[in-house]
Amino acid sequence: MNLEQLYDVIVVGGGHAGTEAALAAARLGVKTLLLTHNIDLLGQMSCNPAIGGIGKGHLVKEIDALDGAMAKAADQAGIQFRILNASKGPAVRATRAQADRVLYRKAIRTQLQSQANLTIFQQAVDDLKIEGGLVTGVVTQMGLTLKARAVVLTVGTFLGGKIHVGMNQYAGGRAGDPPSIALSKSLRDLDLPVGRLKTGTPPRIDRRTIDFSQMVEQPGDTPVPVFSYLGTASDHPQQVPCHITHTTEATHDIIRNNLDKSPMYAGVIEGVGPRYCPSIEDKIVRFADKTSHQIFVEPEGLTTEEIYPNGISTSLPFEVQVQFVRTIKGFENAHITRPGYAIEYDYFDPRGLTSFLQTKAIPNLFFAGQINGTTGYEEAAAQGIIAGMNAALQIKDQELWCPRRDEAYIGVLIDDLITCGTQEPYRMFTSRAEYRLLLREDNADLRLTEKGRQLGLVGDERWESFSKKREAIESTQALLHNSWVRVHHNDLFKEALLNPMQHDCRAAEFLKRPEINYQHLLMMDDLNLPELPQEITEQIEIQNKYAGYIDRQQQEIEKLRKHENTMLPETLDYNDVVGLSSEVIQKLNRIKPTSLAQAGRISGVTPAALSLLLVHLKKSRLPV
């Protein structure tokens, strides 16, 4: 059966990538359809009930700067908030929220249902309609054909999903949900480069069977942080503590003695698991010298008794899970409400994508999320907003966009994927970015909101709030630059100054001192500085205190910008470039980098190879 209505964009999958993709496309004004196998599970947190963390929190702030949904939902669902690396520099500080699963789903669904140009329909997709090298729609499980001018696939772990508990295995997209077997086969028939990955989740435990007196309480931060630039602490529900416990040597003995029953170690699972979120079996084997491992005991919500024991992801048989869980401090009488499991699923080599997340083989087919080899809600959502936006821009015949590596962690994420690919689930860290000092959580809006407004992503409320904030920062910085702190002010600041001033200096220069903050300057009545919110004074302080380092990174970026702007034609045959090794030729012909800078980030492409490319471009009279 055909549904005659033509949609501009169809998004397949209602997880973190799919919801951001659908909202982004709809915000750009195109007719968008979001397809999900279960409307009640839109925005479902399939694994850990948390948002943010090192690198991940930066992505959430960037999504928010582009008017995405994740940060707002986290504020409305967060039951504990913490700033990680709070004692370190601003580049690596990161917000993390423990979230109530039910409240998070509710917040996401509310945003979806209130979005203009967006329709939600409950149907799983079994096939794509391809005509003339383009996707023209999708076919659902009940045989319904839905037409579209562009399709975004955000199918998570559902493609060919297989769940493992011990030696038992069964088809599933996640616990309790069916896999996408037919769609997996359809995509494999398109001859796209496919692989298998694996992830896992720990058993859930009944809170009432836990002895918290044996654990260390971990309270949230006060004052309570917020994720969204539009958020306030009043958005948060009731705040609750988490706890920390540890495995014991008895735990390790049980796991070691049952490794032959682990599908991972028995060779049953072919997919590669996440390096930075290993199973408890992996930890015991890889870190054999450790006598204990830390476990974060995290509540799943305010209206459930289930606890998420972060750190014991496992696919061991259920009876073994019961045994080892009860050797953990405080879990001696634990009742497992849901077993832990591993799940294998299909992913497609992201080197088959452009930087706009469109497939090179089918230009109006976009991929986002775990289908591209990433792991994590935040990584998925970041890809979703870019894929949905670009699908809409393509429909509107406008220039597609993706942030550069020096503009956003989203740019780092996508460039890493499309340039290097991945053989294991990819997770974002601040260490992946060359320009961390520029890509801070606190300035994501200053980096991205204006561009988001130009693209049509950012609504009036956010734009007005951002414009006021930016104006306050710029006007205050000008005031600081044109105001002077005199030597006679030493007495005023004698409690704070590590060393007295030897000469007069501009207020902006005085603020560079590590012991001085904006509040100190307010003590000087003759400066006439305005009282400002904390998030604005923080930005002013960082811009001044780190000005030298920031300028240095900007200079490095300008040097590299020439390579970023040296475009490599898609039709360039690297076999024609004299002097390149066969390895480099093979990689360049496969990946087809769009710029000289991207070519330089491909493993094995040396500076000498880049010089040969430049010579070839000049000889061929191609634009350099």
Curated annotation (Swiss-Prot):
**Taxonomically, which superkingdom?**
Bacteria
A GO cellular component term found in this entry reads: cytosol
Q: Which UniProt keywords apply?
A: Cytoplasm, FAD, Flavoprotein, NAD, tRNA processing
Q: Where does FAD bind?
A: 13-18, 125, 180, 370
For biological process, the GO terms are: tRNA methylation; tRNA wobble uridine modification
Binding of NAD(+) occurs at 273-287
Subcellular localization(s) per the UniProt record: Cytoplasm
Tell me the PANTHER family matching this sequence: GLUCOSE INHIBITED DIVISION PROTEIN A, PROTEIN MTO1 HOMOLOG, MITOCHONDRIAL
The similarity comment for this entry is:
Belongs to the MnmG family.
NCBIfam families listed in its UniProt record: mnmG_gidA
Its function, per the record, reads: NAD-binding protein involved in the addition of a carboxymethylaminomethyl (cmnm) group at the wobble position (U34) of certain tRNAs, forming tRNA-cmnm(5)s(2)U34.
- The protein depicted here goes by the name tRNA uridine 5-carboxymethylaminomethyl modification enzyme MnmG
